[in-house]
A protein has these predicted regions:
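Short, exposed beta-strand "edge-strand" segments with a Pro/Gly-rich flavor and a Y/T-containing core
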Residues: 61, 105-108, 158-160
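Glycine-rich beta-alpha loop elements in corrinoid/cobalamin-binding modules
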Residues: 1-99
Length: 172
């Protein structure tokens, strides 16, 4: 406990709050004030690199801002404090102003070969909706392209997992 709710209130000794997942990726601004970092896209590729970089910077005794500026250069890493949301007169989002030397656009990360990553996940906490379940990911995305659906509209091309690999993981 005792992690400050707003990113702007966190100090040098506080942990970084990292957000990810589909909702944070496709509309991070409602949560921007709470996050130190947001992973844009699929985290499997970028998360190990991000954590290695944070550890390297910590060992080099970099301060919080230096660490955040450094990881903001990684593809797929959005550091909200270095951007300011801009809105039109009607309140519609119009873009981001850069407050530091950071990328103007964040490159959404995309796992090219989903079979390179685990097919299954066992949730062992009793405090989740899927408590004590064995989850199997058979595909990502959707080919239907419904404009109201994030999975179909934002991820477009479906990526199906290899059936033999799925069956092997399930049997284990």
């Amino acid at each position: 406990g005792h992690i400050k709710l707003l990113a702007a209130e966190r100090g040098e000794q506080d942990p970084f709050v990292i957000l990810g997942g589909p909702c944070a990726s496709f509309n991070p601004e409602p949560l921007a004030a709470f996050a130190d970092l947001v992973i844009i896209g699929e985290g499997e590729e970028i998360l190990p690199r991000l954590l290695e970089e944070l550890e390297r910077l910590r060992l080099e005794k970099k301060n919080r801002k230096e660490m955040l500026l450094a990881v903001a250069q990684l593809p797929g890493v959005y550091v909200p404090q270095f951007y300011e949301a801009q809105y039109n007169e009607d309140g519609a989002f119009s873009g981001l102003a850069l407050l530091e030397k950071v990328p103007a656009q964040i490159q959404r990360q995309w796992v090219r070969e989903i079979d390179d990553f685990p097919h299954t996940s066992a949730i062992i906490s009793p405090y989740t909706e899927f408590a004590n379940m064995f989850l199997v990911e058979v595909a990502r995305g959707c080919g239907r392209h419904c404009r109201f659906c994030m999975a179909g509209y934002c991820f477009r091309r479906p990526r199906n997992r290899d059936l033999e690999g799925l069956l092997q993981d399930i049997r284990q």
